[in-house]
Amino acid sequence: MDVKAEVIEIIDELFMEDVSDMMDEDLFDAGVLDSMGTVELIVELESRFDIRVPVSEFGRDDWNTANKIVEGVTELRNA
C-alpha cells in the first residue's frame, strides 16, 4: 500500500472520515482533526511508518490537509 492510501486508511480508522475526496481540505476546519486527534494521528503514523514526527515539525499549518500529511510522512521516511 502506498503512503497516500495508508494515510487515508489511518484517518478513516481513527476518525471515521473518508478524506479521499478532500485531500486538500483543512482537516481542522472540517472537524476531522482537533488537538487530541492530532496526538492520536501522530502516534499511529509513527507506528505504521516507523518514523518519528518531531513536535516542532507537526505544525497545524504544515500538516492540516491529507496531502500535507502524505508529504510530511514521505519526507520523514526518506530522511
Curated annotation (Swiss-Prot):
InterPro entries: ACP-like_sf (IPR036736), DltC (IPR003230), PP-bd_ACP (IPR009081). Pathway: Cell wall biogenesis; lipoteichoic acid biosynthesis. The keyword Phosphoprotein applies. 4'-phosphopantetheine is transferred from CoA to a specific serine of apo-DCP. One of its GO terms (biological process) is cell wall organization. Residues 1-77 form the Carrier domain. It holds the Pfam family PP-binding. GO terms for cellular component: cytoplasm. GO terms for molecular function: D-alanyl carrier activity. It is found in: Cytoplasm. The modification O-(pantetheine 4'-phosphoryl)serine is found at residue 35. Changing residue 39 to D/R: Reduced binding to DltB. Keywords: Cell wall biogenesis/degradation, Cytoplasm, Phosphopantetheine, Phosphoprotein. The keyword DNA-binding does not apply. Carrier protein involved in the D-alanylation of lipoteichoic acid (LTA). The loading of thioester-linked D-alanine onto DltC is catalyzed by D-alanine--D-alanyl carrier protein ligase DltA. The DltC-carried D-alanyl group is further transferred to cell membrane phosphatidylglycerol (PG) by forming an ester bond, probably catalyzed by DltD. D-alanylation of LTA plays an important role in modulating the properties of the cell wall in Gram-positive bacteria, influencing the net charge of the cell wall. Belongs to the DltC family. NCBIfam families: dltC, PRK05087.1. This is D-alanyl carrier protein. It comes from Streptococcus thermophilus (strain ATCC BAA-250 / LMG 18311). The lineage of its organism: Bacteria, Bacillati, Bacillota, Bacilli, Lactobacillales. The gene is dltC.
